[in-house]
């Protein structure tokens, strides 16, 4: 009995021992295709550090961090990022792609809140829509509803800067993590973010297993297309946003996906690392010349875009 007490005290002392941020330098998962995140650990610790690099367009040397404290281990000294106590059980997902990644590992039941419920097609989310909170869109967030959902974590994304939700979430004491999947240059890099979300819910091993099969299947299809003799159809992307039409860079994952599928992206002027706005007249001209038009939102006819426009 004395031995057991001593062991318990030793364990408690080890668990409560503080660590330095610099101790979390052992790679727990090294992404093969994604460049926007890394998962690290410290020797003798169950807690992990998820770092997200340059999480929005135009970000330069920006890193946001989420410390996932496990087994009651304390936050490292000097850490000023977000802290998640244990695995996330209640998640608010601000993008439908976050839900798709959680769905890939069978964990959508953890989603308690979303942005734009009517535009999410996931069967589990729609089956539970009466119990899922729609917190609204950035710039018009229902924070009272968000608080009532009692989330462990909010999954965010940034467009041309930090999310407008960030400061309010800090004020409310709600942890968040940026998901920069859409900034990846390859479809496989985008897909690999499911491993980062798997870590957040304590299912990294499952996430790694699910992802491992994706490059195999993707590259097999890519090889099949490259061996076919065909004329590449020209492809237009996206829909109007206000008075502009945002066209992805030729290095964007969506354009890479089109190329790998045997298509020809119609707009080659943007070779940077972010989408660029063009005026509606140029966009409509491109669309009229394209063989295909993808990512058209909820529209099923061109009239939905041409009839409201006086031009």
What is each of the regions a protein language model found here?
Residues 90, 152-154, 162-244, 268-269:
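Extracytoplasmic substrate-binding proteins
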Residues 224, 230-304:
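Flexible, glycine-rich surface segments
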Residues 87, 97-101, 107, 142, ...:
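Stable alpha-helical elements in mature extracytoplasmic
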